[in-house]
């Protein structure tokens, strides 16, 4: 049985977080005063402390993560690695695998269809896919981060927004390609600690047909497009501040700063399609959340010590992971 990422955009957008996302308010007119630009930290940084979830003598230590993080930061991971080495299990964020009986050459044959799926199915340019006001906002951000790119104008709004967001992060010395999980995974492997990845598997009988169906499906993705633009227009300095706060271990700043995220809105645009619904993907985020909580329950029952990784925006809030763990009767202590 081979695994094949049928909807790479879904996996990227939906599963960085498993709880409901905070919405981003529509952009306000830019102030006439100049705001000082936040400088992004670099070099060796300690990172934050861990949340402690406990019952009796069993502890679950949760490292809250932030995305993006400073691109040129090196995390001083020794303290957490030593905790992993003393623990019985390392619990990852929930993940999804799309399983299909597809061989190597068959997967290669699917690439052209997957590439076509990035573009608007009716061939209309981006300008005709979104409102005039929204397109003007797009042009401002495009000029800033993408320059004169013409190919991007063929993309679906959700794909264009994703590319714009990636380039904006890079230009601001931020990155979503962090090595946090990689470092902890290597530590667990080195110390023979059990690693658990809570997984939801989607079975796809005919990936070629599914991709073709997706390529001809019109998405309701203007909200994703607008939310991404708003994030870049209004949240970039806070984004840097959150990244810096994580790097230097300022937990209070992480708690105080807002955590807007456009990925939930963008994921909804993809998961609401008929092609996703027919294949059991419409409630995927709820499935992933439930699977992680189930794995956490099991770890707390059988292990004296477990280390877990979870996005901070998924941990916090009335409907966050920490609230769910409190409802289950666990004691939750914030990092010092």
Protein language model features and the residues they cover:
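Short, well-ordered alpha-helical scaffold segments within catalytic/effector domains
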Residues: 4, 77, 289-293
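Bacterial N-terminal signal peptides
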Residues: 5-14
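Short hydrophobic "helix-edge" motifs at membrane interfaces and signal-peptide entry regions
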Residues: 6, 54-56, 301-302
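Boundary at the C-terminal end of the N-terminal hydrophobic targeting segment
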Residues: 18-22
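Structured, acidic catalytic/metal-binding patches in enzyme active sites
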Residues: 24-41, 47-280
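A cross-kingdom marker for long, charged
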Residues: 270-336
């Amino acid at each position: 049985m081979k695994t094949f990422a049928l909807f790479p955009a879904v996996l990227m957008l939906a599963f960085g977080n498993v709880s409901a996302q905070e919405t981003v308010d529509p952009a306000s007119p830019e102030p006439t005063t100049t705001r000082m630009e936040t400088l992004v930290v670099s070099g060796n940084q300690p990172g934050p402390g861990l949340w402690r979830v406990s019952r009796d003598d069993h502890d679950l230590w949760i490292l809250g993560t932030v995305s993006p993080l400073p691109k040129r930061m090196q995390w001083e991971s020794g303290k957490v690695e030593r905790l992993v080495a003393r623990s019985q299990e390392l619990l990852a964020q929930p993940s999804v695998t799309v399983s299909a009986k597809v061989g190597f050459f068959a997967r290669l044959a699917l690439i052209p269809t997957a590439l076509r799926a990035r573009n608007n199915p009716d061939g209309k340019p981006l300008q005709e896919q979104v409102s005039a006001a929204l397109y003007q906002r797009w042009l401002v951000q495009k000029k800033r981060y993408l320059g004169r790119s013409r190919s991007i104008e063929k993309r679906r709004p959700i794909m264009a927004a994703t590319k714009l967001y990636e380039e904006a992060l890079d230009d601001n010395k931020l990155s979503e390609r962090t090595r946090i999980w990689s470092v902890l995974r290597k530590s667990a492997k080195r110390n023979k600690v059990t690693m658990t990845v809570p997984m939801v598997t989607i079975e796809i009988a005919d990936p070629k047909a599914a991709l073709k169906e997706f390529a001809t499906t019109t998405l309701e993705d203007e909200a994703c497009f607008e939310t991404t633009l708003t994030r870049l227009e209004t949240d970039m300095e806070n984004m840097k501040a959150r990244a810096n706060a994580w790097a230097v271990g300022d937990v209070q700043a992480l708690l105080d700063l807002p955590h807007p995220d456009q990925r939930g809105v963008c994921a909804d645009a993809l998961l609401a399609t008929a092609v996703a619904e027919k294949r059991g993907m419409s409630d995927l985020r709820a499935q992933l959340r439930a699977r992680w909580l189930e794995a956490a329950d099991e770890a707390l029952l059988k292990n004296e010590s477990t280390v877990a990784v979870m996005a901070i925006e998924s941990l916090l809030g009335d409907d966050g992971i920490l609230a769910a763990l409190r409802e289950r009767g666990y004691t939750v202590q914030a990092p010092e």
